């Protein structure tokens, strides 16, 4: 089912801390339900969003591009028109001010190792759910002698309860 292109996203939210860079581009790493939901929600709020994960998610990503976005159903009704869905981690990380890692904690080390070579000074990494993932990321970055100045943060719990009901469609269980 192709999504209507008549709904345009709102202007990007102004996320700014004194003297900090405005966040406009977000990369979501995680091709599961929470990654899809987060990418769609951020895109619906007006952010430029890239969704990224491994090759096993390539089919889902092709469907997102074919549909023109990710459909949110349930307690949130919107179409998240993400810019790119890719398996290319280097492309996904490049230029993102925020990298939101929405994967299960057993994958934290894998993701830290994959993104480390491509990180840039000033990027922010948000790990969701955290489960002390910031410690894993820091340990991996130290082992790899990664010298880029990035900010590591984490959030306990997922952004919202959700279920991937079909490719390019997520049902959200609570209002945001």
Where are the predicted features?
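Rossmann-like NAD(P)(H) cofactor-binding subdomain of soluble oxidoreductases
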Residues: 105-168
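Acidic, Ala/Val/Gly-enriched low-complexity intrinsically disordered segments
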Residues: 2, 10-11
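Conserved anion/nucleotide-ligand pocket segment
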Residues: 169-176
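NAD(P)+-binding Rossmann beta1-loop-alpha1 motif at the extreme N-terminus of oxidoreductases
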Residues: 15-73, 93
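A general structural motif
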Residues: 23, 46, 96, 121-122, ...
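Rossmann-like NAD(P)-binding element
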Residues: 77-119, 123-126
């Amino acid at each position: 089912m192709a999504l209507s292109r008549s709904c345009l996203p709102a202007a990007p939210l102004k996320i700014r801390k004194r003297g900090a860079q405005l966040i406009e581009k977000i990369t979501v790493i995680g091709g599961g339900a929470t990654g899809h939901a987060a990418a769609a929600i951020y895109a619906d709020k007006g952010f430029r969003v890239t969704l990224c994960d491994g090759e096993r998610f390539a089919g889902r990503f092709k469907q997102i591009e074919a549909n023109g976005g990710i459909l949110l159903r349930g307690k949130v009704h919107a179409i998240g028109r993400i810019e790119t869905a890719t398996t290319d981690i280097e492309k996904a990380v490049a230029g993102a001010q925020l990298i939101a890692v929405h994967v299960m904690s057993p994958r934290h080390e894998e993701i830290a190792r994959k993104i480390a070579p491509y990180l840039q000074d000033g990027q922010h990494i948000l790990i969701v759910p955290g489960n002390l993932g910031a410690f894993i990321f820091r340990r991996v970055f130290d082992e790899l002698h990664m010298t880029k100045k990035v900010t590591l943060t984490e959030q306990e719990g997922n952004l919202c309860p959700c279920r991937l009901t079909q490719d390019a469609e997520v049902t959200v269980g609570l209002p945001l």
